[in-house]
Amino acid sequence: MKLSKVRTAEEIIARFKDGQIIAIGGQTNQYMPDRLIDCVLESGARHLTIYSIDSSDPGHGVSLLVEAGRVDAMITTHVGTNPLTNAKIQSGALKAEFNPMGTFIERIRCGGAGLGGVLTKTGLGTVVEEGKQIIEVNGESYLLETCLLYTSPSP
């Protein structure tokens, strides 16, 4: 018997719990899974860690979760278009880890592929390097960027 991948909103809402890590696709306000974000809000889940390219513009996408106080931490590439997210980060109300976009995507891919991480030159000699392991391969230095898992602790 073939199982359907289609779920009702109620079934989806029931899956969200406090403290979960949720990866959300889209960028700025484009291709955001708006109904999924509505389901997260309707679930009442709090203390979430969000993996997203950005935090969207105010009143849209991921920003709705930040505005509702549901997000404790984000792993992202930037939040430059959202003054509320920036203010929450500056005040310490929201933890954030920033990654170059390609590195961010590669970390998610590595998690899904069961890999421990990726070696990259991106970020060497910058603030991105701080606190990360540098590995030498064939005389070249690389940053080890660990994979992003959906069971890893918040940053």
Model-inferred region functions:
Residues 83-149:
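An acidic, phosphate/nucleotide-engaging active-site surface
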Residues 2-101, 106:
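N-terminal active-site beta-alpha-beta segment that forms phosphate/nucleotide-binding
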Residues 150-155:
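Conserved small/polar residues in nucleotide/adenosyl-binding loops
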